[in-house]
Amino acid sequence: MSKEQILSASKIKTFESCSWKYWCNYHLKLPQENNDGARRGTVCHLIFELLVKARHKKHFDLIMEAQTLDASPAVKRLVKKSLVKEEGYSEENYLLCEEMILVGLDNDFYGAKGEVNSPEKEFLLESESPKYKIRGFIDKPVEYNKKLKIVDYKSSKSKFNKNELKSNVQAMAYTLAAQTIWPKLKNVIVEFLFLRFPKSPSQQIRFTKEQLSGFEYYLEHVYTIINNFTESDAKSNLASTKPMPKRDEGFCGPLNCGFAKYKGQLKKDGTLMWHCPFKFDFEYYSLIDADGNLLKNSFNKEDLDESKGEIKHQSYGGCPAHTRQDDDFDFLN
């Protein structure tokens, strides 16, 4: 029997965007190259998680007074070390991290008139009717007398459009979790702080009981599907077969595939053209235990511990929507 699939906001978002991407990510567990945006987001989250603790407020005060990380050698050093660890250090990445960290610190970081008692709060919601399980992490819950504000940091290049915000899975999941974790705080607001937008970083949303009730039935629907998901299902809702999104529909449909026609294609400025990590074929390695279970996949053989199992060389053939199929009569064309 396959392992139970527990929902998360990112898992649902992937499932909605493309069935093949979901299959590659959560069933095949194929490796992915990290990118600078993800690296910067990881580093910023680490700094926020540390500075929100009262014992580190002296670093916050120094940085805010000088408006630069130079004022705290310890924080500056940690940012640089973290970027190196993420294999993404460059002066450009460091300066972008500094800018984003300053935006986060400058926006009610300690929750004026509120308390931040549980940063990086983990939750697991289990419901029998409707039936679902969903887990997640809340970046920063700010508790007030009768209100809870859940702050989530975003390092993306674009903010949510109106439709993306009003039906945001992550925000609804956070609000559901808040009902369990902080039952006395009935007024729940979710605030997304977009760190690349210093002039207007905040987007806020709250939901009604009716909206949350409907969301729970949607969770049951997705939970049922992903726990009976097959390779045939993986080809049933491909991003490439969806219509191109309208201006107010955000990043969806074929945009998820990217416009690159082949691996390594360059844009006019000489930089790599982005594409879905599973669009084209690639080689990788798998670590398999004695019972035949997959332990880990990696592009680098050196990342796998051979003492824990057998290392196998693997080939991924690419997305079926973008892979040219062999044709016995191809010579006629």
Regions found by a protein language model. Give the residues of each.
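Short acidic, Pro/Gly- and aromatic-enriched capping/linker segments at domain boundaries
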Residues: 2-12
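Metal-dependent nuclease catalytic regions and adjoining charged, substrate-binding loops involved
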Residues: 6, 177-333
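Nuclease catalytic cores
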Residues: 12-57, 256
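Intrinsically disordered or highly flexible coil/loop and linker segments, enriched in small
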Residues: 21, 53, 57, 110, ...
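Residue-level signal for well-ordered alpha-helical scaffold segments within enzymatic catalytic domains
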Residues: 25, 46, 50, 103, ...
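Hydrophobic (often cysteine-bearing) scaffold residues that line and stabilize catalytic clefts
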Residues: 36, 40, 44, 93, ...
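A non-catalytic, helix-rich entry segment at domain boundaries
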Residues: 47-122, 126
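Mg2+/Mn2+-dependent nuclease catalytic core
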Residues: 116-227
